[in-house]
């Protein structure tokens, strides 16, 4: 539907690309000393407006990987970061728009 929101499969490759971009940008803009990685995409929608715009609801979790100034990690590296023990894990539910 032009201009309207359409549900998308959370496993769709384009949704996964948008999610990877969202995680990298979230970490780049976050003042937290550690990286957050994707636990899962909860919901995904898209809108066709001069390209594809994605609306994502994602669960993120804080990792043990500390950020190093001038050496940002890429999505695949972030996803390989270890997690703290279950009781010490910090999870966030975040909404992202990727265009």
Swiss-Prot record:
Q: Name one GO molecular function term.
A: cysteine-type endopeptidase inhibitor activity
In terms of InterPro entries, this protein maps to:
Cystatin_dom, Cystatin_sf
Q: Where in the cell is it found?
A: Secreted
Source organism superkingdom: Eukaryota
> Which organs or tissues contain this protein?
Expressed by the venom gland.
Q: Does the keyword Disulfide bond apply?
A: yes
Q: At which positions is motif Secondary area of contact?
A: 47-51
Domain Cystatin spans what residues?
Answer: 3-99
The main location is secreted
Note the CDD domains from the entry. CY
Q: Site Reactive site: which residues? A: 3
Q: Which UniProt keywords apply?
A: Disulfide bond, Protease inhibitor, Secreted, Thiol protease inhibitor
Cystines in this chain: 65-81
Pfam families (alphabetical): Cystatin
Query: What does UniProt give as GO cellular component?
Result: extracellular exosome
Q: What else is known?
A: Negative results: does not inhibit calpain.
Functional note: Inhibits various C1 cysteine proteases including cathepsin L (Ki is 0.1 nM), papain (Ki is 0.19 nM), cathepsin S (Ki is 1.2 nM), and cathepsin B (Ki is 2.5 nM). This protein has no toxic activity and its function in the venom is unknown. It may play a role as housekeeping or regulatory protein.
Tell me which PANTHER family the record gives.
CYSTATIN-M
Similarity section: Belongs to the cystatin family.
Name of the protein: Cystatin
